[in-house]
Design a protein with these regions (language model features):
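Conserved AAA+ ATPase "SRH/arginine-finger" region at the nucleotide-binding site
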Residues: 204, 216-229, 242-250
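An amphipathic alpha-helix signature
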Residues: 225-236, 252, 256
């Protein structure tokens, strides 16, 4: 992209002359290419990493609420020390959604200056493990990714179910993924946002003191009925357009009451 942009800016180049001949708005083309390259790094070529900034760029629905938690995450990420975030909450409370909302805010420059050029990548541990056959292969792949990340100041890595890092790849004679990660976090070579449930945090994460002290905790409580109602009000238009129907506020309130009565093993806002 950078090479293409440089060629297009050179008004005496053949490329510029050809595009002018076909009445292409070169300035608009340069703008679009610059916008696209703003969300890209060499990490886009790695299949186990997903560029969340790019993923949410064309998302049609908005993510509502959690302003206090987002502010807390931004404050932690902007700190000089202990600037890694660990989001704790039950399944369905919106841990991944809050990271997507942060990426949306970065895209629209709605964050503090220190976060304005950041790109968030999700590291898929399952994809990383799936391609391994031999002992030590997982650790080798994991370390290669981390080595590439540490050279990029504008990258934040998001690891969902981060408790799986503790013990991942660990076998007799092998080191687990958390032991690879710890030195990089200690030297502040990279920034990580992790997400896990409350049970898994106490079961795995809290016991690993060296790993635990590298992170600042952000707890995501289950949304109340009132908060869930506001979320549903904000997103109902997308369902109305898709199904060609109208959903009244009365129906939304009834829906929340019904799921509260009949669905006990899930949490708001996911179950609504």
């Amino acid at each position: 992209n950078l090479l293409t942009i440089s060629l297009l800016k050179e008004k005496e180049s053949v490329a510029y002359e050809i595009l002018q001949k076909y009445h292409v708005d070169v300035e608009e083309l340069i703008y679009l290419l610059q916008e696209k390259s703003a969300f890209e790094t060499p990490l886009d070529q790695i299949s186990t990493l997903v560029n969340i900034n790019k993923k949410v760029k064309n998302k049609k629905y908005k993510i509502i609420g959690r302003e206090n938690e987002i502010e807390q995450i931004c404050t932690i990420l902007s700190k000089k020390e202990k600037n890694n975030v660990l989001i704790i909450g039950e399944a369905g409370v919106g841990k991944s959604a809050i990271v997507e909302k942060l990426a949306m805010m970065i895209n629209h420059h709605q964050v503090v200056d220190s976060l304005k050029n950041k790109i968030i990548y999700e590291l898929s541990l399952s994809s990383l493990v799936a391609g391994t056959k031999y002992r030590g292969e997982f650790e080798e792949k994991f370390k290669k990714i981390i080595d590439k990340v540490k050279n990029l100041d504008n990258v934040i890595i998001f690891i969902d179910e981060i408790h799986n890092v503790i013990g991942a790849g660990g076998a007799e004679g092998a080191i687990d993924a958390s032991n690879i990660l710890k030195p990089y976090l200690a030297r502040k070579d990279m920034t990580v946002i992790g997400a896990t449930t409350i049970d898994e945090y106490y079961k795995h994460f809290e016991k690993d003191h060296a790993m635990n002290r590298r992170f600042s905790l952000v707890t995501l409580k289950e949304n109340t009925k009132e908060e869930t109602f506001e979320i549903l009000k904000g997103i109902k238009c997308y369902y109305e357009n898709f199904h060609h129907i109208k959903i009244s506020d009365t129906i939304l309130k009834e829906l929340i009451n019904l799921v509260d009565q009949h669905i006990k093993n899930r949490t708001y806002p996911d179950k609504a």
